């Protein structure tokens, strides 16, 4: 498949009118939000993706398809800009207080998503992860700090350092248990909250280095994303998989991904056919690595942001 040509627009940096000094400026929220929106679109259009919605099929999902995801992404897009603005406006506060500024926007984004999808959860995890990245970039830029993977990860770590303690370990008898809380109680897995509290360790230590290495070796964006998705599937304790198939389902997917990586990943001549075959297996088993899909979009977004601000600095 061909990744949407709309990605070419990312090279056209959105700009405002010239300032009084004649120098051109750009809208940070619009630019970063634009990239985050395309991260969502890139993820869903990447085909094949084992167990996930793509242009070929609905994966292991019966309540959503490609059009559902597109409608959801379009509904969420304005809030991605707002995350950046909220981060910028929080510049006078420490990073540890950033989450409280982003959370109300995240709730509104979820409501917009559910309205666009008739109640289907297409992007809840994506809103959380991309919202943190967008907010962190706004905060870093306003504080005149370097925008690179290390600073983005550390800002998110500080913002979310108490998430696991406050929301998973704390017993809340008066509130209904969320899926993430149930999985933590049953298996001790911290899911998206734990990933955020770690400063996106899975992205920083596994996915981003893999993606960069693939590109260095001459992989196309599509090939690099396939390989990186396999790296995530092999290493990520994906709560989506645990929710659907327990630890056995998680370990099955991890082993399948490890086998394809052992064959060379994107360098394996039959990688596309192998991914298609694994897609069929995961659909039959009703397994969907949705958490890894969210982190794949986050990986691409962080990579593009780092490249962008290298140029702009």
UniProtKB/Swiss-Prot annotation:
Keyword terms of this UniProt record: ATP-binding, Nucleotide-binding, Transferase
Keyword Transferase: yes
Gene (name only): citG
Keyword RNA-binding tagged: no
Gene Ontology molecular functions: ATP binding; triphosphoribosyl-dephospho-CoA synthase activity
Name listed for the protein in its UniProt record: Probable 2-(5''-triphosphoribosyl)-3'-dephosphocoenzyme-A synthase
Species per Swiss-Prot/TrEMBL record: Vibrio cholerae serotype O1 (strain ATCC 39315 / El Tor Inaba N16961)
NCBIfam families for the chain: citrate_citG
One Pfam assignment: CitG
Gene3D superfamilies associated with the record: Triphosphoribosyl-dephospho-CoA protein
Top enzyme category: transferase
Origin: domain of life: Bacteria
EC number: 2.4.2.52
Family recorded in the similarity comment: Belongs to the CitG/MdcB family.
């Amino acid at each position: 498949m061909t990744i949407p040509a709309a990605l070419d627009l990312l090279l056209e940096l959105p700009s405002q009118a010239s300032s009084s000094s004649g120098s051109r400026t750009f809208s940070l929220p619009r630019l970063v939000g634009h990239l985050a929106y395309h991260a969502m679109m890139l993820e869903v259009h990447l085909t094949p993706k084992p167990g996930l919605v793509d242009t070929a099929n609905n994966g292991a999902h019966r309540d959503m398809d490609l059009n559902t995801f597109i409608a959801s992404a379009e509904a969420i897009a304005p809030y991605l800009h707002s995350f950046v603005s909220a981060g910028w406006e929080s510049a006078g506060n420490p990073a540890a207080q950033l989450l409280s500024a982003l959370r109300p926007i995240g709730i509104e984004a979820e409501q917009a998503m559910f309205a666009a999808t008739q109640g289907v959860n297409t992007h809840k995890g994506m809103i959380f992860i991309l919202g943190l990245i967008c907010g962190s970039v706004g905060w870093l830029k306003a504080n005149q700090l370097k925008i690179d993977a290390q600073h983005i990860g550390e800002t998110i770590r500080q913002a979310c350092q108490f998430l696991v303690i406050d929301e998973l370990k704390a017993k809340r008898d008066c509130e209904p248990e969320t899926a993430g809380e149930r999985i933590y109680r049953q298996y001790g897995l911290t899911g998206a909250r734990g990933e955020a509290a770690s400063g996106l360790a899975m992205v920083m230590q596994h996915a981003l280095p893999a993606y960069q290495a693939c590109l260095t070796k001459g992989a196309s964006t599509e090939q690099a994303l396939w390989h990186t998705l396999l790296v995530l599937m092999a290493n990520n304790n994906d709560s989506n998989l645990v929710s659907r198939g327990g630890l056995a389902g998680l370990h099955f997917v991890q082993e399948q991904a490890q086998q394809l990586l052992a064959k060379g990943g994107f360098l394996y001549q039959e990688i596309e056919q192998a991914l298609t075959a694994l897609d069929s297996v995961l659909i039959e088993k009703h397994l969907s690595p949705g958490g890894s899909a969210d982190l794949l979009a986050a990986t691409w977004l962080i990579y593009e942001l780092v490249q962008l601000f290298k140029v702009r600095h």
